[in-house]
UniProtKB/Swiss-Prot annotation:
It is found in: Cell membrane. The chain crosses the membrane at residues 624-644, 658-678, 692-712, 733-753, 779-799, 813-833, 841-861. This is Vomeronasal type-2 receptor 1. It is a multi-pass membrane protein. Glycans are attached at N24, N38, N299, N386. Putative pheromone receptor. Coiled coil: none annotated. One of its GO terms (biological process) is response to pheromone. Belongs to the G-protein coupled receptor 3 family. CDD domains: 7tmC_V2R-like, PBP1_CaSR. The gene is Vmn2r1.
Amino acid sequence: MASRQISLALGFLAFLWAVLGAQNKTEEVQCRLMAKFNLSGYVDAKNHSLVIAGLFPIHSRIIPVDEAILEPVSPMCEGFNFRGFRWMKTMIHTIKEINERKDILPNHTLGYQIFDSCYTISKAMESSLVFLTGQEEFKPNFRNSTGSTLAALVGSGGSSLSVAASRILGLYYMPQVGYTSSCSILSDKFQFPSYLRVLPSDNLQSEAIVNLIKHFGWVWVGAIAADDDYGKYGVKTFKEKMESANLCVAFSETIPKVYSNEKMQKAVKAVKTSTAKVIVLYTSDIDLSLFVLEMIHHNITDRTWIATEAWITSALIAKPEYFPYFGGTIGFATPRSVIPGLKEFLYDVHPNKDPNDVLTIEFWQTAFNCTWPNSSVPYNVDHRVNMTGKEDRLYDMSDQLCTGEEKLEDLKNTYLDTSQLRITKQCKQAVYAIAHGLDHLSRCQEGQGPFGSNQQCAYIPTFDFWQLMYYMKEIKFKSHEDKWVILDDNGDLKNGHYDVLNWHLDDEGEISFVTVGRFNFRSTNFELVIPTNSTIFWNTESSRRPDSFCTQVCPPGTRKGIRQGQPICCFDCIPCADGYVSEKSGQRECDPCGEDDWSNAGKSKCVPKLVEFLAYGEALGFTLVILSIFGALVVLAVTVVYVIHRHTPLVKANDRELSFLIQMSLVITVLSSLLFIGKPCNWSCMARQITLALGFCLCLSSILGKTISLFFAYRISVSKTRLISMHPIFRKLIVLVCVVGEIGVCAAYLVLEPPRMFKNIEIQNVKIIFECNEGSVEFLCSIFGFDVLRALLCFLTTFVARQLPDNYYEGKCITFGMLVFFIVWISFVPAYLSTKGKFKVAVEIFAILASSYGLLGCLFLPKCFIILLRPKRNTDETVGGRVPTVDRSIQLTSASVSSELNSTTVSTVLDE
């Protein structure tokens, strides 16, 4: 029995040993942090129901780890940042202020756990892991190291740090509210679902910068960015907006996060060699500090810098000794504010309050350049390589001991400067945003909540992060300035403005940030306001606004000619073509002038075209008018002579009626040339051709009547036979038929397709030639074709009858008249076709006058000569001639011919 009990006891012990061994084995394989992170900061979580985490760049960098050490090491930090220290103190001050209020979280108090991010991604990620796990936990339990509920994070003090932290915290949907991270990628809710911020995105800042560039007329701007998310995405957005505005980025370089002489010199070279005099700097003050030293080292002073909100008010850059190089900097900053009670809270800091507060000790040592007694806290340490890249710069601890009696009132540093509380104000608003979200969550009424089908509520401290995010997305509250803080769907500040700041040097030799304008934004509406009376300091030799262009703006009269393979701001100025103008400077294309206008000599303005037509007032027109009137007077003079001597044998032998018709037609043709002179109009275009055609028709028809009479007379003299009588009525009938036929064709011409006036702008671009469009070419050719046919018949009949008796030379006169007529109009054709404008009209008038003068001279001047100067030859015996040589026995006088013809029924009558 005893042995049995012993066996059972041994078995139980074996079982217990196996179970405990298995448990120990399980614990050994549990996931845990491999080592503790070297983090510094502040914590106050005891006796508080909620804790807000904070990440602030209290230091500006980490100390490089010795590459010989193989084991992973959490690096130390260096480069105390007074600005980041003030932001951290502002968070603590705000939490204490909220805890004292009764209208926000009345039944709860807030604690905090704040870590120093050292402005380094690795430290931001270390801190994020600790926020989720604590340094001793095996897995995330959403409690900090004090055990209180972690609600949200304020931070992380830089875009790249916020991106890194949010990629970890976003996995658990932990709310993160940024106070200075403006990188546009953080607006992407797919990548960063739980990130919010109380400042606008860089999309708006880039929009503001481009508007500023456009306002000052700059088109060629350089860009330099930090080699991080803030710089890369900022410049990317800036370039896109510059391209949309048809502006150009001359160069784009980066400032290395870890000093690289090669990369830094590349950026410096771009600044020195580029023609761009305006440069945008997308970087933080910490990253910019070394670049500033490079600018000073290379003595680059003639540049205008456009600053972003990350460094525009930074005391690290805005030092009086930097003003010759960066004076006149212009840029954007979020609105500044006055925070009640903050200044007193900032002064309430002293190492004696907590001997273990290493950050306060380092602050004191750095501020007063002394060493705190019995402290091993280093300060003023800089392990970065200098600009030569060949040596380290290390500042040892001061031999002077701190007494503790030093007065903060004697300091002039960023920490105590409360005149430019811009990002500091945003730290306060970030804390309040979380507090208001928690307050809304705590006020949920059971059965009226937003969660689940039962409208459940979430409760403190058991809520989940995603439940708090529901309220954070809907956040809307009034700040301490009584201004609304509203976030949009991307978690960015929806409404607000940027101040436009300009760096001046005040009377005390310090840099002052002068507000010269503002950029208002409300949803998608933007407005840049810079009053004309704003006092802007420009760091140029002339103290005037600088120009920044690749190619100077093309003057009026030229257009931009894009250079192949170069930005659109680099171009050649090409003169506008004839007929095109550019009235403004910098036009891309020349504008065509209107139909009635033409470009001036400078191609800068459209001027009315010169109007050309054969005017009465010009020399050529006046000469032709004189010739026309003179010709008409000569014809009238001949008519007077004929009327006075109408009973003389010579006039009677020339058929007086037909002669008068010829004289009248010559007056018509000569005076019709006046219709070709002067500014054409529709009625004159129709009248000129019709009048000319009818005049020539009457003239040639009358001549044709005469030539037929001569032809019959010649046939009688040759054949000695009696022909059919040519009674005078038949000659008149020939004239009537020809004229009536011509009138019919002209009427059809005017009705169907009449000539019209039109403005010819094709022959000479600089002129508008007023001329007549002759309408139907077929009708016009038909009309004048009939005249040519009549002239040809006249010539043929008179040519046959040219051998009538010598003293009777009517046939010869008509023959010569027709020859002159043909010569003139045959010569007219090539001359007319080879001339343009008013000279073409002058050629036509000359042909009309020449042919009219030719007919007048050949038909009437010889007879007038006899009538007026040789009256003795104006007798029946003299006027009658001899029969041609083929039959000299036949004498043909006017009397004998008349007697002979009148004595028979078949005869040819030469006269009545």
